[in-house]
């Protein structure tokens, strides 16, 4: 096993566990693995060679040692470390696999779709100054927002700090984490009970053996019983500490989940769903190609007002055609029909103007001149439209 693999393993455990789990990992590495590897081997290396019995009967000493220690202390603790750490290693492997799969899926989605520039529509006042109709027409134009600026804005936003529990829940690993925690606790309890029944709380200085092939009860003596007793009690304490950390972590997960649910409910009560959207005073923008019409002041509904509205609508249609389809190849096939409708609209407008002027000033000489001028203007406009070379130019 290389150091890089061990470093990667510890980093992943650090990222996918709570702060109580990190304490448990520290206790496992320092007080179990290191202590068993360094202290256990040096204390128990001569446990069988220094096990001496006061008999010369062949095989009696081996049988008595088997009765005294059915399983070596060091091997028992190594087996305990392996089984206790197995649920955590399995959880870690599952977490790495799931997160790598999620990242791979997100990378495929990003590669499938292109990265368009973020566009914002702003009002430009300089374009309005080139027109001569003295009307307020909102002009919109797109503004490109670079992707780097967008990423910088996202990075500048402060993220809430957490101890790992919320990250486990966001990654969908909470159930697996709780299962491995329960399995780890069960292993701790099982090994604690087994250690008590195998070794008790003390290593006695001598052991009385009466098993076959020993001819009678004999006394066997153990080397360094006090040192081994102290080390045995230390291992009891480490096992109890790990068990308490497991219980603490379960309480931490339970109370933390309850607290998060209560906080979410309180936020829902404080911030109703109907008012979750932010209020803004910005003027709503329109997509490209969308004409925003300003609502005019209401005037008295007469034939003249109706004719003016029709004239303005025709003028807006002509301006839109000149803006988006001024080329000859884009003109419709029924151009003559369009010209005929425009002439009819102009004639109706002239008649409405004459009727309106006649209604207001029935005996004024200026009215006659206006009528003659309007008729001459209408004749000129009709003549110009007939003599045109196929373009929709109108003289008024």
Swiss-Prot record:
A GO biological process of this protein is:
visual perception
Tell me what this protein is called.
Gap junction gamma-1 protein
Among InterPro entries, the record links this protein to: Connexin, Connexin45, Connexin_CCC, Connexin_CS, Connexin_N, Connexin_N_sf
Q: Which domain of life is it from?
A: Eukaryota
Location, primary (coarse class) = membrane
| Extracellular compartment spans | 46-75, 199-228
- Positions with biased composition (Basic and acidic residues): 147-156
Q: What disulfide bonds does the UniProt entry report for this chain?
A: none
Gene3D superfamilies assigned to the protein according to its UniProt record, in alphabetical order: Gap junction channel protein cysteine-rich domain
The molecular function terms of the Gene Ontology recorded here are: gap junction channel activity; gap junction channel activity involved in AV node cell-bundle of His cell electrical coupling; monoatomic ion channel activity
> Cytoplasmic side of the membrane: what ranges?
1-22, 96-175, 249-396
Cellular localization per UniProt: Cell membrane; Cell junction, Gap junction
Q: Where are the transmembrane segments?
A: 23-45, 76-95, 176-198, 229-248
Any one GO CC term of this protein is:
connexin complex
Map out region (Disordered) in residue numbers. Answer: 145-165, 357-396
How does this chain assemble? A connexon is composed of a hexamer of connexins. Interacts with CNST.
Q: What does this protein do?
A: One gap junction consists of a cluster of closely packed pairs of transmembrane channels, the connexons, through which materials of low MW diffuse from one cell to a neighboring cell.
Q: Provide the family line.
A: Belongs to the connexin family. Gamma-type subfamily.
